[in-house]
Amino acid sequence: MSDESASGSDPDLDPDVELEDEEEEEEEEEVAVEEHDRDDEEGLLDDTSLEGMCGTEHAQLGEDGQRPPRCTSTTSSQSEPSEQLRHQGKILASEDPKKKRAQKPSHMRRNIRKLLREDQLEPVTKAAQQEELERRKRLEQQRKEYAAPIPTVPLEFLPEEIVLRASDGPQLPPRVLAQEVICLDSSSGSEDEKSSRDEVIELSSGEEDTLHIVDSSESVSEEDEEEEKGGTHVNDALNQHDALGRVLVNLNHPPEEENVFLAPQLARAVKPHQIGGIRFLYDNLVESLERFKTSSGFGCILAHSMGLGKTLQVISFIDVLFRHTPAKTVLAIVPVNTLQNWLAEFNMWLPAPEALPADSKPEEVQPRFFKVHILNDEHKTVASRAKVTADWVSEGGVLLMGYEMYRLLTLKKSLATSRPKKTKKRSHPVIIDLDEEDRQQEFRREFEKALCRPGPDVVICDEGHRIKNCQASTSQALKNIRSRRRVVLTGYPLQNNLIEYWCMVDFVRPDFLGTRQEFSNMFERPILNGQCIDSTPQDVRLMRYRSHVLHSLLEGFVQRRGHTVLKIHLPAKEENVILVRLSQIQRDLYTQFMDRFRDCGTSGWLGLNPLKAFCVCCKIWNHPDVLYEALQKENLANEQDLDVEELGSAGTSARCPPHGTKVKGEDSALPSSMGEATNSKFLQGVGFNPFQERGNNIVTYEWAKELLTNYQTGVLENSPKMVLLFHLIEESVKLGDKILVFSQSLSTLALIEEFLGKRDMPCLPGAEGQGTQKWVRNVSYFRLDGSTPAFERERLINQFNDPSNLTTWLFLLSTRAGCLGVNLIGANRVVVFDASWNPCHDAQAVCRVYRYGQKKPCHIYRLVADYTLEKKIYDRQISKQGMSDRVVDDLNPMLNFTRKEVENLLHFVEKEPAPQTSLDIKGIKESVLQLACLKYPHLITKEPFEHESLLLNRKDHKLTKAEKKAAKKSYEEDKRTSVPYTRPSYAQYYPASDQSLTSIPAFSQRNWQPTLKGDEKPVASVRPVQSTPIPMMPRHVPLSGGVSSASSTNTSMNFPINYLQRAGVLVQKVVTTTDIVIPGLNSSTDVQARINAGESIHIIRGTKGTYIRTSDGRIFAVRATGKPKAPEDGRMAASGSQGPSLASTSNGRHSASSPKAPDPEGLARPVSPDSPEIISELQQYADVAAARESRQSSPSISAALPGPPGQLMDNSTIPGTALGTEPCLGGHCLNSSLLVTGQPSGGRHPVLDLRGHKRKLATPSVTQESIRRRSRKGHLPAPVQPYEHGYPVSGGFAMPPVSLNHNLTTPFTSQAGENSLFMGSNPSYYQLSNLLADARLVFPVTTDPLVPAGPVSSSSTATSVTASNPSFMLNPSVPGMLPSYSLPFSQPLLSEPRMFAPFPSPGLPSNLSRGVSVYPGYMSPHAGYPAGGLLRSQVPPFDSHEVAEVGFSSNDDEDKDDDVIEVTGK
């Protein structure tokens, strides 16, 4: 499990708060990040992101109770009309399946969807861009009118940086000056290179283009332009002190405003680049003292690399803000492990007045006059936190808190003082303290007012790249802040993909870059398409153009300064990559693991979260002892050993337990928030089990037992990585250099400690004569991970950095705990033991030593296992870093890898090259590395190389001025015109799954053998047009009494696919290439259901119809139908729904109470059988039935036409769907209550009630009384007939279609032998007397199809039959079968009710046809589910969804190929 700092879990939170963190983690796993998160665009083999994985965090995602709508994945293949805007409620799948193109491999380039025209952009986007344009124009005007003696930027604003549109700003009349030159041809930069005459600003005025020319006196040299590419105030030649040593902040201010200077102690400390950063913050957040009072301000991103002193710049700006503006409160949200560091920085640079000595001079040191409040681990209760917040609001000043603390205090669902632990059974009633509840509500209101609405005057987010998942609850909470003055501090603005960058920019400048879809079309896809070595020349050109445009759009409020600033002031830094060979045991384990994965097919690499594989492989290539220990302990939390942020969520993870503690199984599931390919909560595996427990979702190590049977632990040489690590440690100590070792695996850190305890320390310089010493923790080495308390961290860091400390030489750190807010300049050597998925983490780890204060040359060693997944991850790091350099730094890194190399994670080499006997060390200058190559050449696959060599800036690829203008021009033209690109599918084509490895035999069976499989089925496209809402799907219990357990619930549904196939059901696993949206209804509590593109689903086709089963257990019944028939009351009639006869439900649980009395106003009234409505509907039925018989064709799909209550359904024949839907009946549309006859024979029942399924009659009829008496007496028909061929069902028996239906043409009129079980509440003439010849076969006492039910003659016959009635056999329209029992089903679960159907009868008019289907209906619609009793104690719980249905009808001429997805969800 990722440790505390990695997750950022707040140590100042009590255990209840930690539970909230776990909830955040679980919720951010469910995002979509689409997320990603957002890691949501970071799917394993995601063709959209070079990250490939993400969530979300993950996640992520709206985790509060009121979840916001998910962002539509930019890689989703659903068709989006170009008119779609941000606030549209629905996404229509309008793409014609005939127009779909063949899918492309993931590594190939992708086309770009239609771009939105300029007039289709969101108004908020236009307004945001216009505001920024006007702000920059005002600043430029001030620079011209009030020129400072020492300007900070060139006096002339770079002309090509301003691109105006007529709709965005006032038009300027074209003017031509004598010295101007108009350049109409921008295809080449030769003219610009030959001449330094003039710049050109392109202005578009709607219909025509007008060129406005700027005088040549305002042109800017190429060198100045180079300096401008990092944003404003980046020219350090102008960021200088004045003659008196002061630092003026508000350059070019109006004369009526006062000069704003830094405090003297700050002015002496700041460096030129920091002066530029302070001025940059002032320009964006304040702009001018007068405008601060009237405007809401702007946000900005201070993107200085790690170690450039962002904290000092912010402290200096806060001091200026409080001294010269009316601002009163500043909220600083920082990672929890940097809280103490921030407080120490404030006290050092701006000491409190009482901390100053009495003789201090104001001209030397100015104390702060504001207070610094902090919420840390000392504030355990909500009341104490509320007091700190209230003091901050009343007194003003700065409030420091962690990200998780802010989320907990601002999200309504998170705030709680304590949470009672979940128990299996409550022995006493729950007592609710109303006064405490009122206090909690008051605290919540106070927090919301102080932190969000209206919130502080300025918000500062340190390490702001954590705001990378637009749907993560932390991001959502931050965006709720009303203040627009938002500052993000980050040394790594672009980590994994451009969507994360967009999310962070969207926080500081909402809507500036448009919606996520607009940004993806304009920038993300073009930039990604040209990133690799196999990209087309057009792709590369467009990539370079769009990278420059994106950089120039943001340079007004994103200031980027890189490590080039540090190189001037710090010693040299050398970063080498050592590619390490695997030992024999490691290679055997790795081969075995890969073999199992490949044999698993789509359920392996393409179906599992790759982070699980990464965890297992990390144990292999770090050292087999780590894998062996996990195998021996059977640690349920093994996959959370990795200290990786994404393993928990895009934003946070649960706190890492202290080393050696046991983690509960339910918290051990490996989340998949690295930008999951789908957004399902827990995607299931091949087994049909939608109720799989999360605790079972773990990685097992059965596959490794045989190889590790006689394994000898404690052998250092079993891992070449470990051998090289100890060589680097010992040689560094011999040279007198302190060294840091970073690993993301906590178990690996523990193993390193074990080996250290067995080895002697090397001889220190000058101490050769002294005896040897052992490595001792907290004496000769330190360890820091997420479980280290904050105060202990500070002590260890200060002690390690102390130059007088000559006993401690080694510091072991977890990558996520030690990469933020830790200053370890006491060391000058770093070993990154394993590569992180996110390159930001390794880069931040390196910068712990390479920062201000470092006195020695720095050496960094990256150990990477070659020919493994780790090498692929390192390659991805290079690609991500190259994209960051290109977009953020406007550099031109080399293209080193093909897209296939980057995106294909499955890297398996059967045979490694032979070990080398020697390595060429001519290019290696560092002595420790030279000695390693000489001593261990057989452990290294190739000569070590510098990490920066893969990121060289190709200055020859730098855009010329003309190319830059062409880039901006093409960008503007693309926005103005709708580019006619085709719109193929952008899906990932890979079914993402979070299933457990235990569900795959290859990983759970020791002697498993792979089975031969045929070719994979082709990927199918399943596209819905209309659908019904998701009703409740009952969970079924075994026949034994009592409440069902989780295990029994699981096993009841977890039958294998081959069982279905043997039973004659076709099961096909396919991958959807487009999002399938299943809209809900206003009358339903269900929101839109969705099957995401790339999700693995099963198509189940049998005699009862066609179904779709998703990987998370949802079942969709596919129907062919068309447009709905308009009912008289203007609403869609809910057909087959059951009203007051249903048992009441509460919170998803079946209630044992009797049904409530029906509301007379809501019940339908009986209709006279002589009414014109009935006669006309009977005639309609007769016509259709006759037409069906006359066709003499194969059975067709019947589509139900709903109508008002009591109205008969019409049938129309619709061709089969593309899925090959079998003939089926409109399931819930035809119920027994809708069976009619013509004129009642004999006049026995003068009243014809066609609405019996809506309610029971107020006064039971004589027929009903007789039915109840017969039911209680238990009349049973004749013995069981021999089986013929039958219907396969999962309950353990088969239903013969012929022997039960030999009397289907018998008259409907009631006879003496009528089956009383099926009478229901309707008059007897509605019932089919001999429709089901044998009740014991329909309601068998035994579930074994081979054991016929024996005769029962006791008085308990009815009870026996009732107790064995499978719940799926209950027809919703027969509520009278058991008068005292209320059925829980609101509609059929399968495709059609076969129990009763309107078969021809002499009782109908003579012109009605006798034509019937091939398989006349006789079964319940619940025939596909296991048998369960009718006892109330056995009725499973149900979700508290309101059940609503929508029927659809169609004419044969309209929408013949429309599909309707009938959903039966949990």
From Swiss-Prot:
GO molecular function, one term: helicase activity
Motif (DEAH box): 462-465
Gene Ontology cellular component terms for the protein in this record: nuclear speck; nucleus
Gene3D superfamilies attached to this UniProt entry: P-loop containing nucleotide triphosphate hydrolases (3.40.50.300), Tandem AAA-ATPase domain (3.40.50.10810)
Binding site for ATP: H304, S305, M306, G307, L308, G309, K310, T311
Location of the Helicase ATP-binding domain: 291-511
PROSITE patterns membership: HELICASE_ATP_BIND_1, HELICASE_CTER
Cross-link (Glycyl lysine isopeptide (Lys-Gly) (interchain with G-Cter in SUMO2)): K114, K126, K271, K664, K681, K758, K900, K1013, K1017
Catalysed reaction, written as an equation: ATP + H2O = ADP + phosphate + H(+)
Location of the region described as Disordered in the Swiss-Prot/TrEMBL record: 1-137, 185-235, 649-670, 1026-1045, 1120-1170, 1184-1212, 1259-1281, 1444-1466
EC supergroup of this enzyme: hydrolase
Composition-biased stretches (Acidic residues): 11-49, 1451-1466
Mutant phenotype after disruption: Death by 11.5 dpc. At 9.5 dpc and 10.5 dpc, almost all major tissues are proportionally smaller, and the neural tube is shrunk in some embryos. Dramatically reduced cell proliferation and increased apoptosis are observed in 9.5 dpc and 10.5 dpc embryos. Embryonic fibroblasts stop to grow after 2 or 3 passages and exhibit increased apoptosis and decreased DNA synthesis compared with wild-type.
Biased composition (Basic residues): 99-114
GO BP annotations, alphabetical order: positive regulation of transcription by RNA polymerase II
Compositionally biased tracts (Polar residues): 1135-1154
Keyword terms, alphabetized: ATP-binding, DNA-binding, Helicase, Hydrolase, Isopeptide bond, Nucleotide-binding, Nucleus, Phosphoprotein, Repeat, Ubl conjugation
Subcellular location(s) of the protein: Nucleus
Family according to the record: Belongs to the SNF2/RAD54 helicase family.
Full protein name: Helicase ARIP4
Species annotation: Mus musculus (Mouse)
The organism's taxonomic lineage, starting at the top: Eukaryota, Metazoa, Chordata, Craniata, Vertebrata
